[in-house]
Curated annotation (Swiss-Prot):
UniProt source species: Caulobacter vibrioides (strain NA1000 / CB15N) (Caulobacter crescentus)
Protein name listed in UniProt: Anthranilate phosphoribosyltransferase
GO CC terms: cytosol
UniProt keyword annotation of Zinc present: no
UniProt xrefs under InterPro entries: Anthranilate_Pribosyl_Tfrase, Glycosyl_Trfase_fam3, Glycosyl_Trfase_fam3_N_dom, Glycosyl_Trfase_fam3_N_dom_sf, Nuc_phospho_transferase
Amino acid sequence: MSDAFKPLLAKLADGQTLDDSDAELFFAACLRGEPTPAQVAAAVTAIRLRGETVGEIAACARAMRRAAIPLEHPYDVIDVCGTGGDGLHTLNISTAVGFVAAGGGLKVAKHGNRAITSKSGTADVLTALGVNIDATREQQRKALDEAGICFLFAQAHHGAMKHVSPIRQQLGFRTIFNLLGPLTNPAGAKRQVVGVSAPRFVEPIAKALGALGAERAWSVHGSGMDELTTTGETEVAEWRDGVVRLFKITPEAVGLPRAALADLTGGDPAFNAAALTRLFDGETGPYRDIVLLNAAAAFLVADKVETLVEGVALAAEAIDSGRAKAALAGLVAATNTEVPA
């Protein structure tokens, strides 16, 4: 079986790109464990050295989506997450944004994992907050119905990644697989705000989201962060109506003060959970400001507001009214309550 992949590997070794069908077939085979570890490593290394194309990113994501365990639901959900890998060890921003978005009336399917390069990933901080990250699909659906937000633990929904995980660990550098988390939401989110770890990925990820069927999506990188940032300028690529629009955002443009990166530095899951709790209890400052900015983007992408300034106001209301805190409490309750299958 592994001999069948040699022509494809030869193309990659020569610096050629894979067409969409070949890329999807190969990555689907990787998720079934058919190529040898050496072949998988050779392929992803060659793609990394040449640079991932939009077609390859979308094809790999499409194969991963098809191998995933989905969450069925009737909603127009949004996801707010990043690729990770920015190495800045900030507080959990997109996690907090998920609850603010739910508090503002959106249905949020938050896709995430444990920390890989950071000290506290989404799954880690949610566990510290009392969320059962190993919730059943029935519990996830209950949370989405009642709290407006569910958490989709990547390891539980993407079991096929077990075939490539050891290879990724042994390589120890970023490959195309590191870009796929935000592109493979098991709830089929058509609206997304995706943070990327480097400026060069901003436009390709937006185009890949479009190729995968997104209705409206932002791909963002903020001065070194895989988030919209209040520390400087954020680069944005928006996918909407079949085209990508590139622009930049500053915090001042939406009425928020600029922050220092040191003001956003996080710690272990307990530290970050405590900061998130204080945020929802009314603490103001740089953490609140960056959460407001990112939540505003979510409201805009979901067509809940018409401008980022309106989105900031709605995000502030979601926190100050207690609705964001209630969304967190609802997720904790739903994931720790037995629900019949």
